[in-house]
Amino acid sequence: LYQPNLEWMQKLTRTATGGGIKIGPASNFLQKFPGCEIELISLHGECREATVWFGSMAGPHTFRATVLPAGESLSEDPLSAWTNTTPTSCAYLFDPDPAIVRSGLLDVMAERNNLLRLDAEEEYLTADQIPTTAFVTAFKIEAVLSNSVKELKHYLRQSPSQHYEVKCRRISIEADVVRRQLPTGAEPPRVIIFAKVAGRGAIVVAHRITGAS
């Protein structure tokens, strides 16, 4: 529930000269504040805050995403862009910042950075080059396997890693259960990403790239 109540806040956005109302990032704010700009703010990869900017403080677009501590910000209408999908993954996979996803600006950001969707229903993106933006975390793709933990285990036995980071968005898995099943060895850490690729479930074996954005 909103506190103060929603009606009070809506009236404030219509009558005050300008200002901002801080609300929870998980709030149901869609279509609740017409004529305002809603900013989603993330800190260290976690969406922490949403602010409804109104009057003289509002920007020209409906949504804004800001990532901290980088300070990069993007403001646009979420419906102004639509990112193409690709039948196969490229050299890199990108995990978008939660502020971009929550604000609905994923396609806008992807289009501006020449990124493609792995699937129309999947937030993971791909490209052959790493963009200069703080809105994504980059991973170098080593292999793309079918959505089979058995196949994944067989692949990793050839050169098992010291540690595995397991990630997913649209494919529901129990990361800890999967991690415990994977063979360990002396190779550098890997990231195991369960994702939809061109309409099918897949497992992407990758390496996290630090300092790419």
Question: What would you call each of these model-derived segments?
Answer:
Residues 1-213:
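SAM-dependent transferase fold signal centered on methyltransferase-like domains
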